[in-house]
Amino acid sequence: MVKLPSLKFLRRSTDETPNVSETASHSTVLDVGAEKLGKTYARALLAATQADGSTDAVVSDLNAICDEALLHNPKLQLAFQSPQIDADEKCRVVDRLFGGNSHPTLIKLMKVMAKRGRLGYLVAVRDAAVDLFDEAAGRVVAEVRTAVPMTEQLRGEVTQQLSSRFGKTVRLRESVDTELIGGMVIRVGDTVFDSSVASRLDKLGKSAAAGFARQLIEQSDRFSSSS
């Protein structure tokens, strides 16, 4: 686990402080460009870790940085994203905060990204790295969007049905989208199972938690596929 040191050293005098007005966000810009960029760096990272068998450790460290350090420190994410902070300063930040806790291969990649103005895409790299890691291990990643958080029962049902459908171990990546009119949207690779119409839940009634996922998967021929 990455223990985040104090950020006091980032505090500069008024004249030295960059004029940064953007709002930090844990999620990297969700566009095709960011996704492709994330995959490019993720492939390079995993290739570099295969030789010494450090993939598990590197992915774990990358998850810790994204889910602990960046998520809970908007100021740090702003620093990574801002074009007004030069690459050398970002590299110093990486060294001071993570150099003693994270794998050297990951630190090297982060510095390369900083020098190329790409450090703000670190979360996209993490997402792609985890997906590639799961794929190599024979796991399938299913992105599940629901109008409300899933119950344990529904989570288990979705996992079971998807595992049966694809013949592989499934890991869910869950998100809540309050704009969905009930139901859920499941994406596995290029395949999308969409049942986000409230009337479906009304028909299912109290059996929704136990049977919704099964009906969704079994009737997948009615749902759309997108690339």
Swiss-Prot record:
Subcellular location per the Swiss-Prot or TrEMBL entry: Cell inner membrane
InterPro entries to which the protein is assigned, alphabetical: ATP_synth_OSCP/delta_N_sf, ATPase_OSCP/d_CS, ATPase_OSCP/dsu
Key word Ion transport present: yes
Keywords recorded for this protein, A-Z: ATP synthesis, Cell inner membrane, Cell membrane, CF(1), Hydrogen ion transport, Ion transport, Membrane, Transport
Main location as per UniProt: membrane
A GO BP entry: proton motive force-driven ATP synthesis
Function noted in UniProt: F(1)F(0) ATP synthase produces ATP from ADP in the presence of a proton or sodium gradient. F-type ATPases consist of two structural domains, F(1) containing the extramembraneous catalytic core and F(0) containing the membrane proton channel, linked together by a central stalk and a peripheral stalk. During catalysis, ATP synthesis in the catalytic domain of F(1) is coupled via a rotary mechanism of the central stalk subunits to proton translocation.
Descriptive protein name: ATP synthase subunit delta
Species annotation: Rhodopirellula baltica (strain DSM 10527 / NCIMB 13988 / SH1)
